[in-house]
Amino acid sequence: DDESIQQAWQILTNGIYNCPAGNNQQGPHESIFCGRPSLNNFQASSWSKMCNYYDPTTTAEAARLMVSVAHKYRGNNNFEYDLVDITRQAIADRARIVYNYAVADFKSFDKKNYNTHTRQFLELLIMQDKLLGTRKEFKVGNWIQQARNLGSTSEEKDLYEWNARVQITTWGNRYCADIGKLRDYAHKEWNGLLRDFYYKRWEKYWQVLQDQLDGKLPVLPVGNSSTPTADNPAMTIDWYALEEPWTLAKNTYAASAEGDCIEVAKEAITLINN
């Protein structure tokens, strides 16, 4: 038995794994990275229910404890999987906190802190992408490769790849994504998808808000609408036009693990604590 590992699991047991009775959310907490950006981002899918039933800082402490003893378990597949998965959640939870800071900065016209927090948010997203690249289970390349392997001809392979890409992003054409609100229904925190799909959305969004703060665009009233109205600055962006090119692309993603998961997890903990 390892005291640090036991403590880490106890923290998770008392926190994120301790969903209270009566909570009717549809599955686990959804990552802030994976939903279309807005000023009231809480979940990724359009209909899922979520509530803050645990302290989001506790996952970082659990990850820190795992990292502190990781050298003793190098090469242990089960430990390394858990290390990456727990650290993945810690990054997402920290990003949600930083997101709230950035939104508050925008609403108060605090450009200095807005720049700081939006930069931190994007750094966390890229760090999660790097971390998940160390495990094949968290790589979009593995998903796409499996889809292409089902095809017998080049045409079939391309079709199956398109289906694989669409399923985890827009779920179909513009109508499905925007009117049907099926976008991000099957979102994934996966290496490759994070940096090439989710990062581009958030980078664009933060820049639009930055332009508003800089007077390059009119600062629109802050509302709670998720539809294209003047009350929602996010909707000055045509999200589907930004998303569709990735679903049509044929760029190759590595399917095998890349990098040292323990060393990258250490980097992630340092970034979370900054």
What positions do the PLM features span?
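Substrate-binding groove of N-acetylhexosamine-processing glycoside hydrolases
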Residues: 1-274
